[in-house]
């Protein structure tokens, strides 16, 4: 079987806190996006790659130059435009494939910020969905206890009650002093005055039974995915992943269990973890 890879890479990664977008952060001698591409570029079943990039992306040319020097067969890499939302970028990446992709061809969509996809997980996904009419995605069952955060502010606490000295019955009551405008805004809640960005409270514990964490790649038939995204965008609904677009049109993508090591880079700390995972994989390969 053959498949096409679409990689949305137009994001700027505001949470990452770096001058470069996270997909171009250095990682173990390469960039994050090069690691994300590696399993696909090494797979003979990958017919081509469509990467959605920001119009003013100044970093891709250097990466593309290194990829062009790779030994062996490297599938064609097509540059597509990026969009405001992920769904727009994916749709532009699909459109850039043009007549290369047939209606029933498989398309895999993979995050540019997931550098730790293992070749084994990729092959497992391909084998599991090879004959499926719609497709599915790599995912992992939720293992942690899940908490829903409250949207309500923390209840006010009168911190003066425990420290104030009792007033005798003979002591006259003093008139209240006028409060400044700042004191009026924060009211009588010292915690809000001191901690305007207070941590949220727990509203409830969510039953994790049946809950899975969606990963990528997500694998769907070309025509079905294009149609689902077109209908979602036309309705003003912006799916956070491709599977959600399929859900909205009545499909039920398959959850294919993958490795929790297939992490997404969202902060600088994640780069440390990704480096450790890649090192461990390389060490395991050498010792086999």
What are these regions (language model features)?
Residues 107:
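Short aromatic/hydrophobic "clamp" motif used to bind/position activated sugar donors
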Residues 253-257, 263-266:
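Conserved active-site beta-strand element of glycosyltransferases/polysaccharide synthases
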Residues 3, 74-77, 211:
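Short, conserved active-site loop motifs that form the nucleotide-linked donor/cofactor pocket
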Residues 1-58:
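N-terminal glycine-rich phosphate-binding loop and ensuing alpha1 helix
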Residues 117-168, 172-179, 183-254, 288:
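Conserved core of the sugar-phosphate nucleotidyltransferase
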């Amino acid at each position: 079987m053959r498949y096409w890879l679409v990689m949305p890479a137009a994001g700027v990664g505001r949470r990452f806190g770096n001058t470069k977008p996270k997909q171009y952060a250095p990682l173990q001698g390469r960039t994050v996006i090069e690691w994300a591409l590696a399993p696909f570029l090494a797979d003979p079943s990958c017919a081509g790659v469509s990467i959605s990039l920001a119009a003013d992306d100044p970093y891709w040319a250097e990466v593309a130059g290194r990829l062009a020097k790779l030994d062996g067969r490297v599938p064609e890499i097509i540059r597509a435009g990026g969009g405001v939302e992920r769904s727009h970028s994916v749709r532009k990446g699909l459109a850039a494939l043009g007549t290369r992709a047939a209606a029933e061809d498989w398309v895999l969509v993979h995050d540019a910020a997931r550098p730790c996809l293992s070749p084994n997980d990729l092959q497992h996904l391909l084998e599991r969905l090879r004959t499926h009419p719609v497709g599915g995605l790599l995912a992992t069952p939720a293992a942690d206890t899940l908490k829903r955060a409250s949207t309500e502010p923390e209840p006010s606490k009168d911190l003066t009650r425990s420290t104030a000295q009792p007033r005798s019955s003979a002591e006259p009551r003093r008139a209240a002093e006028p409060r400044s405008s700042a004191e009026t805004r924060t009211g009588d809640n010292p915690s809000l005055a001191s901690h305007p960005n207070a941590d949220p409270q727990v509203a409830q514990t969510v039953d994790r039974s049946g809950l899975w964490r969606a990963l990528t790649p997500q694998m769907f038939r070309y025509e079905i995915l294009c149609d689902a995204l077109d209908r979602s965008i036309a309705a003003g609904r912006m799916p956070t992943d491709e599977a959600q677009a399929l859900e909205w049109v009545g499909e039920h993508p398959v959850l294919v269990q993958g490795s929790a090591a297939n992490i997404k880079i969202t902060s600088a700390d994640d780069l440390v973890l990704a480096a450790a995972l890649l090192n461990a994989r390389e060490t395991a390969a050498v010792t086999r």
